[in-house]
């Protein structure tokens, strides 16, 4: 597009814009020119042409956009680059991705119907395959996120259940500790009672043995007493035929033996009392 075209339209442009426009339209394309610089050139060209409404939308804009698309298609890495429309890259998620994919599919379908260039057809097919791959990838990611959310919900439920079980176990442990202390105190009390009972039993056995010993020493044998009584009854008096002048006042009789036995029993009691006061 030259200067007289702008004059025919009736729009006034500055000298720098005219120089840039002339350079862009007349300069040959460098094959070593970077793809990003080409895209930037196309975007800059579009911004210069459409930023302030210098030209209405029409065939001229379609021609410029087709030039930019051809520049992008000539690059070997254009298949790996995401689609750019109007200098704006679509990076939305969710439903916006679906809407943009539908719009891009319609646009690509229209372009495939309008063009017969094999390179354009390959590029469109490549873009469609990339778009389908992106759809599948987003679908897998969405399913994975839903699965993760489900797992998180289940883990939260398990966590709450385990926390309740931990609280119950803690309460049971505390009650068991209290019962253990009570049982220990009861065991100590029973031990003291058993010791007291053993002491009482030992004292009772000692007392009973002492009583038996006292009864044994205090009660004289029955056969000796009967023999003494028998002797006293059978021999009431014994007369010694001797000279009484040698033993004056000495008379032996059975009645004089009883006081001697009484003295023996009293001495035994006194001995026992000395041993066990």
UniProtKB/Swiss-Prot annotation:
Keywords linked to the UniProt accession: DNA-binding, Nucleus, Phosphoprotein, Transcription, Transcription regulation
UniProt region (Leucine-zipper), positions on chain: 148-162
Main localization, broad class: nucleus
Up-regulation conditions: Repressed by glucose.
Record PTM Phosphoserine, positions in chain: 100
Region (Basic motif): 122-141
Segments carrying motif Nuclear localization signal: 124-131
Tissue: Expressed in roots, shoots, stems, young leaves, and flowers, mostly in vascular tissues (e.g. phloem).
Domain bZIP, chain residue ranges per copy: 120-183
Comp. bias regions, Polar residues: 109-118
One annotated GO molecular function: DNA-binding transcription factor activity
GO biological process: cellular response to glucose stimulus
Cellular compartment(s): Nucleus
GO CC terms, sorted: nucleus
PTM info: Phosphorylated.
InterPro entries: bZIP, bZIP_plant_GBF1, bZIP_sf
Coiled coil: none
Region (Disordered): 73-141
PANTHER family, sorted: BASIC LEUCINE ZIPPER 63, BASIC LEUCINE ZIPPER 9
Family: Belongs to the bZIP family.
Subunit-level organization: Homodimer. Interacts with BZIP1, BZIP2, BZIP10, BZIP11, BZIP25, BZIP44, BZIP53 and BZIP63.
Function in brief: Transcription factor.
Record protein name field: Basic leucine zipper 9
Organism: Arabidopsis thaliana
Gene (UniProt): BZIP9
């Amino acid at each position: 597009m030259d200067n007289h075209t702008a004059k025919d339209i009736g729009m006034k442009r500055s000298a720098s814009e005219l120089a840039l426009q002339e350079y862009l339209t007349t300069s040959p394309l460098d094959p070593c020119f970077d793809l990003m610089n080409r895209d930037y050139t196309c975007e800059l060209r579009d911004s210069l042409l459409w930023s302030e409404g210098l030209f209405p939308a029409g065939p001229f804009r379609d021609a410029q956009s087709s030039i930019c698309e051809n520049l992008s298609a000539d690059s070997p890495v254009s298949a790996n680059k995401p689609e750019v429309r109007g200098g704006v890259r679509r990076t939305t998620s969710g439903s916006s991705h679906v809407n943009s994919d539908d719009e891009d599919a319609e646009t690509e379908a229209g372009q495939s119907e309008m063009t017969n260039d094999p390179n354009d057809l390959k590029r469109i097919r490549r873009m469609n395959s990339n778009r389908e791959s992106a759809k599948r990838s987003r679908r897998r990611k969405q399913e994975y996120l839903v699965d993760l959310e489900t797992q998180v919900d289940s883990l939260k439920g398990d966590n709450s259940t385990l926390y309740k079980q931990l609280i119950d176990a803690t309460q049971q442990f505390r009650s068991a500790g209290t019962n253990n202390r009570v049982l220990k105190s009861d065991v100590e009390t029973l031990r003291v009672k058993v010791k007291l009972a053993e002491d009482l039993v030992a004292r009772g056995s000692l007392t009973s043995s002492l009583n038996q010993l006292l009864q044994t020493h205090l009660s004289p044998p029955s056969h000796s007493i009967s023999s003494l009584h028998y002797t006293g009854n059978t021999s009431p008096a014994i007369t010694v035929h001797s000279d009484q002048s040698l033993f004056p006042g000495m008379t032996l009789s059975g009645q004089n033996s009883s006081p001697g036995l009484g003295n023996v029993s009293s001495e035994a009691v006194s001995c026992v009392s000395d041993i066990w006061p």
